[in-house]
Amino acid sequence: MKTIAICNHKGGVGKTALSMAIAEGLHRKGKRTLLVDLDQQMNATQQAKIDTTDEVTVYDLLTSFDYTAKDGIKHFDGGDIIPGDVLVSNAESDMAKLDTRLTMLADAMEGIDDDYDYAIIDCPPSLGLVTRNAMVAADELIVPVIPNRSSLCHHVPSTWRRFG
């Protein structure tokens, strides 16, 4: 399974739209695709029309050793999804005390490599522990930017210096 994280610490740059488009496009091409909604805004989960009431969500995978990715997978028209959760905004503090705080997502996703061709991770607008979990789990990163002076002269170079 190839895992691609779509991340940028800025909001409004199209991370969710790009994540959904890539996941749905790969699914239409016959690829087994998993979308992981790490954004507490849950836009990908809502667009996939997934009800998360009493369901395992990405928050559970980030903060508990009791669940694996298989426990949270739901099907939608664009493939499969691990739904987001508004509680992801609390995950940073919940994860901070864990020794494995940077590998919780990667650890939870072990065992599904043979089930999918691609996993697409929609990241929140931050570079905190949640996004860093996505980066650790990912084989590739896509950093969408709005092609303006601020993004190209400041945000892209600063992100590259920090994680490059």
Locate each region found by the language model.
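P-loop NTP-binding core
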Residues: M1-G164
